[in-house]
Amino acid sequence: MKLDPKVYQLEFFREKGFTRKQCRVCGEYFWTLNPDQEHCNDAPCVEYYFWELPRVRGLSVRDARRKFIEFFKRHGHEYVEPRPVVARWREDLYLTIASIVAFQPHVTSGIVPPPANPLVIVQPCIRLEDIDFVGLTIGRHLTSFEMGGHHAFNYPDKTVYWKEETVRFAFEFFTKELGIPEDMVTFKESWWEGGGNAGPSFEVTVGGLELATLVFMQYRVVDGKYEPMDIRVVDTGYGIERIAWFSQDVPTAFHAIYGELLDEFRKLLGVAEPPRELLWGAARAAGRLDPEDPESVERYYQVVAERAGLSIREARELLGREAALYTLLDHTKTIALMLGDGIVPSNTGEGYLARLVIRRALRTLRRLGADIELAVLVERQARYWGADYYPRLLSHLDYILRVVRLEEERYSKTLERGLREVTKLLKRKKKLSIDDLITLYDSHGVPPDMVAEAASKLGVNVDVPHNFYALVAKKHGASGAVAREVEEKPKLPRDIEEWARGFPATRRLFHENPYAREFTANLLGVRGSHVILDATLFYPTGGGQLHDTGVLRLCGEEYRVLRVEKVGDVVVHVLDREPSCSSGEAWGRIDWDRRYRLMRHHTAVHVLLGAARRVLGDHVWQAGAEKTPEKARLDITHYELPSREEIRKIEELANSAILARIHVDIEEIDRNTAEKLYGFRIYQGGVPMTPRLRIVRIGDWDVEACFGTHVANTAEIGAIKIVNVEKLQDGVVRFEIVAGSEVARYAASLEDKLDTIASIVGGGRGEAVKRVEKLAEELKEAKRQVSRLRSFLADMLVKSVKATAKSIDGVKVYVMTEELPDENIYREVMLKLSREEPDSITIAVIRRGEDLLMEIGAGSKAAKRVDLRAVAKQLASKGLRGGGKPSHITLYGRGLAEKASKVASEVVEVIASLVSRAGTA
């Protein structure tokens, strides 16, 4: 967006005597008190030189965090506790990528007020869009970092503060708190966009290092166009780790952030410290490094090598190992934070992003050649940071380490299988695209450098993009471009939805009194068989709960309510036919038995979730749910299929909560209060876009924001029976349950099945198990006998088939046309002949009704002379379709059973021609 330069002209700049200048390198404009300054003081326009400046020295990350918070508290800002690194309160973002994310979209859109105004927060963030550059840029890029934010929300009728005050705060903080000379602080004009919002900004740069960004969020981005926001937001981001680095006399941000932990990692990984002149030379030159430009990276190594008196190869090798060390420091902290906040690695959503970081760390570890478990490094991080700002790392340490070890084990197996797929692909294609590389990584876990290595052995050149992992992360929503899946969508025609939006909100009698069975209301509108009332007892599909059914009486006639949906706050009833009137009084009655079973199942799901968390761990979150009158399902995040003992324990705990007769409290409270009282666990079934939340609390057992109908006490559930547990996908486990009266129905169905089994095996129910066990043993013995007989028959057939051998230029061709009761015998004969006669080809002709199946196998010597895939290719014109390997093919011919002998002869002819063409071995 092109802006008028006046947007950046502030009274503060005029008062202090700042000059607006244009950077000689990048061409961007900046404000400075130094009349001789020619650069914007930002990377990659200048080398880093901040170590040379007067400044407060020796701030740790903890010191920098404390100093930032205390400064803004003194200036009237209320401190707000940070949120998790997993953005549970948002449906359009997986990770917390900035401090403002904590207040989007509910606060920035005006749905709810901010928790304080103005406020200060230090928010742990995870951002993966620059993951490929971590380590290389010696600290400019990190995947996890702390963002210090002071935010002000300016309403049309109330301005807190805007540009002038924001810039003054920044100037005072950096000059007074950090002791930076005033003429060294540069304000670079910029533009910021993110999370659907945008606005002009200043980047605060000192000595080549960007220390903060001051954004004035005043536009929303809609279809590529900028619309003014009702609420103008001061969105600042101060780099806490960068401030610590800036204050210390150390070459890299990793020295400043990790301190003694860096030395510990260095020993564990066997990475020797580079020569001092090399490391400091690299640190200074990194300011001019543009990691996205391969030529810039090459120049960087040249400059560093020259300054250190080394060859480029030596410099690249030493700095490569150092960058790997920094990468592992960064990634292991990020892994600990992600898992500490309950992410379960998987192939989708935030779970995929966690797996990406884990696997990149594992690959880095292997390339270093370090003989150490990744879990050992992650544990060091958890203990280092858990005592500081992240207590969850210690309380969830067992889960974190178990998952890391499990992921490492899975990755080794995945990699082994994946490399085989790479070899297959490279034999088919002589050039691999970026999409091919991403598919190989996504589907088979093979990193691009390993693909390139395997390709080079086959003479195939593979260009690996410098930002490969960032591309993969972006594809899977690391930048927030991918929305979480929202369960409920209106299932009405578009014209009905538009029509419904024109009505006032429907009064929800199903919430006011979920035990009511009949009601009266006023008819507001009719379109076809769709009806809208001013109030209703009919629950619309939502929160994973199916809608109510029942009867509506309109204008003296009764209509069946078949379906109920919600469009915004308006409830739409779908009737069995179009009503004869469009206004008047309505009377309704819900199908109570159906409703009550739904209520029991919905509360049962909440109880089950509480039990699953207690047994499996605090990382368990709802990944999906459905409540029907007959049964309910709950999908949870978990890294493996629970054991039988764990499932029984979950069921026992859930039923103990029912026996405890816990009261179910339901209240509507404002969002900020709900989050303060109960945390973000309330967002299990989605994130309502409302200022007030309907909170369903089952004592201390479970609390959630929920739209559904519930029983008043857990005792009303009666009982819960888990009827099925399965792994839905990697990282997600599905529980299916029945509750209340459905438990008795389920038990009755099991009894019916048991009676059926008993009648089949003979005897009563009590003897059924023993009789089935006996039958199972008899079946095993019968299978053993069949196997022995099959082997005996195969030996007999081998002798018989050998007598019919046809020799073609040194290759023996055997044809089996016997009709056998078991197709496995053909394959066993073929296998025996191939082993005993390596220079043979065996053809098995198998009739399947009117169709023909042909199995053709070659011994090791014969396979070198004839590629059976060439046989398959020639036979395709004769109606035989199929394929396979050079030594074995399977062909199928529809309607060819009657011509079996003729087809077999044609196959022999094709083989003969190929053998003759190949010549003798």
Swiss-Prot record:
Do you know which Pfam families this protein is assigned to? tRNA-synt_2c (PF01411), tRNA_SAD (PF07973)
Q: What detail does the entry give on cofactor binding?
A: Binds 1 zinc ion per subunit.
Domain of life of the source: Archaea
List cofactor names only. Zn(2+)
The EC number(s) given in the record are 6.1.1.7
Instruction: List positions binding Zn(2+).
Output: 602, 606, 706, 710
Keywords, A to Z? Aminoacyl-tRNA synthetase, ATP-binding, Cytoplasm, Ligase, Metal-binding, Nucleotide-binding, Protein biosynthesis, RNA-binding, tRNA-binding, Zinc
Q: What is its main location?
A: cytoplasm
* Reaction(s) this enzyme catalyzes, per UniProt: tRNA(Ala) + L-alanine + ATP = L-alanyl-tRNA(Ala) + AMP + diphosphate
Q: Give compartment(s).
A: Cytoplasm
Q: What class of enzyme is it?
A: ligase
Gene Ontology CC: cytoplasm
InterPro entries reported for this sequence: aa-tRNA-synth_II/BPL/LPL, Ala-tRNA-lgiase_IIc, Ala-tRNA-ligase_IIc_anticod-bd, Ala-tRNA-synth_IIc_core, Ala-tRNA-synth_IIc_N, Ala-tRNA_lgiase_arc, Ala-tRNA_ligase, Thr/Ala-tRNA-synth_IIc_edit
One GO MF term attached to the UniProt entry? tRNA binding
List, in alphabetical order, the GO biological process terms annotated in this UniProt record.
Answer: alanyl-tRNA aminoacylation
In the record's own words, the domains note is: Consists of three domains; the N-terminal catalytic domain, the editing domain and the C-terminal C-Ala domain. The editing domain removes incorrectly charged amino acids, while the C-Ala domain, along with tRNA(Ala), serves as a bridge to cooperatively bring together the editing and aminoacylation centers thus stimulating deacylation of misacylated tRNAs.
Q: Hey, which family's this protein in?
A: Belongs to the class-II aminoacyl-tRNA synthetase family.
Summarize the protein's role: Catalyzes the attachment of alanine to tRNA(Ala) in a two-step reaction: alanine is first activated by ATP to form Ala-AMP and then transferred to the acceptor end of tRNA(Ala). Also edits incorrectly charged Ser-tRNA(Ala) and Gly-tRNA(Ala) via its editing domain.
Name the chain's protein: Alanine--tRNA ligase
